[in-house]
Amino acid sequence: MSNIGFIGVGLMGSAMAHRLIDKGHTLTVLGNRARDQIDALVGRGATEAPNASALAQSSEIVMLCVGTSDQVESRMRGDDGVLAGLNADTVVIDFGTSLPGSTKALAAEVAQAGGHFLDAPLGRTPAHAVDGLLNIMCAGDEGAYNKVLPVLKDVGENIFHLGDSGSGHTVKLINNFFGMTVANAMCEAFAMACLLYTSPSPRDS
């Protein structure tokens, strides 16, 4: 079992964190103003860290599940950031949908500090996370990927290593683009149908 630091316990992050506790891992979580999930995890044995640096010092794997690249960067950098407390050979995993350019920059900074950085954006929902059924699009150093793969399997069903740093986030953005394109096309088709289809509906007869 692994000592894991987890940053970002919103809907998806909290589901993943509870799953990791279920699988026997030791968790340290970063506190925030929204106490419900933090208190629930601490009640199940997790430790609350005062800042990201302290969290990193107690972890062999650091996981982030936050909304934007700016949020990832703010928790990685600075005197209280993950990089300030990073241990040698620690693997940092970004589960968010971040910008590939930011990911590559952070990967270089983590490597310089003696660790490894993986981008691993997610597919599916918090309900899937609770049951360990997420899709995970991972990229970065293959040795680091193989090291944390058993832990990824605790939260994921379909896990892919997609190549160099940034490739996971690139594929996730392409996947999102595809999904939004299909949704927009469907909306246009329905709008056209409403304009052109003049026959009475079955409910009108």
Predicted regions: what they are:
Residues 189:
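Cationic-aromatic interfacial patches
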Residues 38, 59, 69, 79, ...:
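A general structural signal for well-ordered alpha-helical segments in protein cores
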Residues 52-56, 61-62, 69-134:
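Rossmann-like NAD(P)(H) cofactor-binding subdomain of soluble oxidoreductases
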Residues 197-205:
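Single conserved hydrophobic/aromatic residue that forms the stacking wall/gate
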Residues 4, 97-177:
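Rossmann-fold dinucleotide-binding core
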